[in-house]
Amino acid sequence: KQIVSLPNIASRVVSISSADSELLITLGVSPVGVVNSRELPAEVQAKIAQYPNMNSAVSPSIERIIMSDPNLVIGIAMPFQTALRKAFNANHIPSFYHLSSNYDDIMDHIRHVGTMTGHDREAVALVQKYNDILTEIIQRHKDESAPRVLIVFGTPTSYQLASSKTYVGDIFQRLGAKNVADVYLPQDVSENALDGYIPLNLETMAVLD
C-alpha cells in the first residue's frame, strides 16, 4: 500500500506511463507532462501528443518533469521509474506508482487516479463502462466451449508467458478460457504483479499443450 500526501487536489499532473497518459486524458485531466508509446492506437497517440512530452517511460526526463512544476507524478512500480522517487522527494513532488496483477487492480487504479485529480465521478463512470463491456462479452460467449490459450508477453530482452495471475491472463480467465501456462504457477504464488509471468524457453514449451 502507498500513502500519497497531497496538499489539495492534484491539478498539475505528470504521467510517466503511456497508459496513465491515456487515462488522465480520458478522465478529463489536462496533464502538464506525458509520455507516449507507438504501441498505442494512432488516435490515442495523437491525443497524447498534444501535451508536453517528458521523453519515454523507460527514461523519463527529470529536468522536464521538474520544470513542469507538477503536484503529482504517476508512474508504474518498476525500478526504472521508482528510482526517480528520491529526486521527486527532494523537489517536494508527490509521486504514485502502481503495477496491476488483475482486472480489479486496474479498476481500483482508475478510481484512485480519479480521487487524486478531483475526477471521482468520471472515474466511477469509466469503471462502470468497462464492467458493462466485460459483462456483455462474457454473456455473449457463456455457452461456448472454453478455449486453451497461451499468452506470450515480449520485452526487448526476453519472452514470457502471462499466466492467469496477470492482468491480461485474468481477463481471459473471466472470459472462460483455460490458460495452459498456469501449470507452472507455484501453489503459493504471491499477489506481486510480476510473479504471474513465466520465462519462455524450449523446456517450457515442450510440456505445454
Per-segment meaning from a language model:
Residues 19-22, 37-40, 72-73, 78-82, ...:
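Solvent-exposed loop/turn segments at secondary-structure junctions
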Residues 68-73, 94, 177, 209:
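Alpha-to-beta junction loops
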Residues 3-5, 59-67, 201-207:
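Short, well-structured alpha-helical segments in soluble
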Residues 17-68, 72-77, 180, 193-194:
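A short, structured surface patch at a secondary-structure boundary
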Residues 25, 89, 173:
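Anion (oxyanion) recognition and catalysis
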Residues 19-23, 61, 80, 84, ...:
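Stable alpha-helical elements in mature extracytoplasmic
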Residues 39-40, 160-196:
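Alpha-helical, coiled-coil/dimerization segments enriched in small aliphatic residues
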Residues 3, 12, 82-160, 181-182, ...:
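Extracytoplasmic substrate-binding proteins
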